[in-house]
């Protein structure tokens, strides 16, 4: 395990350097990270290194117990750091494409997709959570949301970036210019993740110059600085989008139930059959409540984040970015909802 851990540590280091080489490399990473937005930054980087096309990853136990899905034979796990295990330990994720349904029925994997019917509700929720959004189209609203979210939260991360610019291209700059670069790149990176995850064409909204600043983050510490901030803030916004879509879907289901019940009642009344009450009782659809939602505390996450993921003579520390979210996409939320249902 020690040898494997060192290999993954080196992979993490090399991948971090690679994604900061140029704007295209950074955009490639962001395109992958937005699909597994509930993962920590260090996990997103290792997922990108091993399975850049991964859509929704989870541990084998989660696939088996929560989704009744089984990992395909000979599938190779995605190694990531395990902060909850002993020092210098790894855990393994498998993508949904590595799994298949069990014999006794599987739970749907909740991977949301943006649709035109969700857009208005999404924009209203983002405006409510992150400040007024003046735009009337989704892409512009996402850009505004990214800017607002970064403005509100980046200072928590910047205070730590200032202490780790040694040997980077940021080292000779004063605090003001470092902050300008950091804020600009973070806002563009968060916006890219939101737009990409919502299925819009990023080429229509970004060019190379929007990410030219990434080359200044050319040390492990500064790569962590921009990566962690981008990952945390984008996750916060994408969670809001996900919940908004769920709310619309549940409202549509409730509306369909109501319509079906009214139609059945009218049909029964017309037939004037005395057994209709028993029939309706048997066929009544029980309405379900919504999923509860807990917004991440961005300040706490910034203070206890993967700044502990440092490079030293021995490699990466066993400590990793603090988070209670081990599952990306919408898998983690489905797990918690299932647990509440069993309680």
Model-found features: residue ranges?
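Long, low-complexity intrinsically disordered regions
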Residues: 290-335
């Amino acid at each position: 395990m020690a040898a494997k851990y060192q290999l993954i540590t080196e992979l993490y280091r090399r991948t971090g350097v690679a994604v900061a080489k140029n704007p295209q490399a950074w955009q490639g990473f962001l395109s992958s990270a937005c699909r597994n937005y509930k993962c920590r930054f260090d996990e997103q980087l290792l997922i990108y290194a091993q399975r850049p096309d991964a859509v929704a990853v989870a541990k084998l136990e989660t696939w088996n117990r929560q989704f009744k899905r089984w990992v395909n034979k000979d599938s190779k796990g995605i190694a990531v750091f395990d902060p909850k295990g002993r020092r210098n330990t790894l855990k393994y994720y498998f993508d949904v494409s590595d799994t298949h349904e069990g014999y006794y029925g599987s739970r749907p994997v909740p991977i949301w997709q943006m649709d035109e019917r969700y857009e208005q509700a999404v924009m209203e929720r983002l405006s409510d959570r992150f400040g007024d959004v003046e735009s009337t189209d989704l892409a512009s609203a996402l850009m505004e949301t990214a800017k607002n979210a970064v403005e509100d939260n980046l200072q928590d991360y910047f205070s730590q970036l200032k202490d780790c610019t040694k040997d980077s291209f940021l080292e000779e700059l004063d605090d003001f210019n470092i902050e300008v670069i950091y804020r600009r790149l973070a806002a563009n990176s968060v916006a890219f993740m939101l737009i990409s995850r919502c299925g819009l064409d990023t080429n229509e909204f970004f060019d190379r110059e929007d990410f030219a600043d990434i080359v200044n983050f050319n040390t492990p510490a500064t790569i962590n600085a921009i990566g962690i901030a981008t990952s945390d803030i984008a996750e916060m916004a994408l969670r809001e989008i996900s919940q908004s879509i769920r709310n619309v879907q549940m409202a549509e289901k409730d509306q369909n139930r109501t319509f079906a019940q009214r139609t059945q009642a009218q049909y029964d009344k017309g037939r004037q059959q005395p057994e209709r009450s028993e029939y309706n009782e048997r066929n009544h659809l029980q309405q379900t409540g919504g999923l509860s939602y807990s917004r991440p505390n961005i300040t706490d996450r910034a203070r206890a984040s993967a700044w502990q993921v440092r490079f030293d003579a021995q490699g990466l520390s066993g400590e990793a970015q603090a988070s209670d979210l081990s599952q990306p996409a919408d898998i983690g939320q489905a797990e918690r909802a299932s647990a509440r249902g069993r309680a």
